[in-house]
């Protein structure tokens, strides 16, 4: 397994990755998704023999805040440490950044995963998060 910077947006591999985890709403506007990737702070991929099997995408200013926008690992590759490696790659790259944030599903599985890599729920820190969709 190789973790490295993601190169140019490849429609087929991104589509396959998003479909593999059921994130099909992102695929309804491919040109927007492609622009989002191009304008991201960083995108890092996980590769199994050159096959993209996981990806993490971060946005922000890279100085005071980094927001983990997407983290996806194909279902057959989950529970093998790939998500942790992707997160750690971003955390290492932006280790001096004051604040790193993400939004995720409110399940025990996801909360346990993010806590295991050093994240805290905002309410655990006396904060509240707001979102407008």
Range-by-range predicted roles:
Residues 1-27, 125:
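Short amphipathic alpha-helix that is part of the acyltransferase structural core
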Residues 6, 71-73:
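Hydrophobic adenine-recognition pocket in adenosine-nucleotide-binding enzymes
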Residues 22-43:
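Active-site rim helix/loop that mediates acceptor-substrate recognition in acyltransferases
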Residues 34, 41-56:
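Conserved beta-hairpin
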Residues 60-68, 124:
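A conserved beta-turn-beta hairpin within the catalytic core of GNAT-like acetyltransferases
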Residues 77, 81-86:
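Conserved acetyl-CoA pyrophosphate-binding loop and the N-cap/start of the following alpha-helix
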Residues 84, 106-132:
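Conserved active-site alpha-helix within GNAT-family acetyltransferase domains
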Residues 93-105:
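Conserved GNAT acetyl-CoA-binding A-motif
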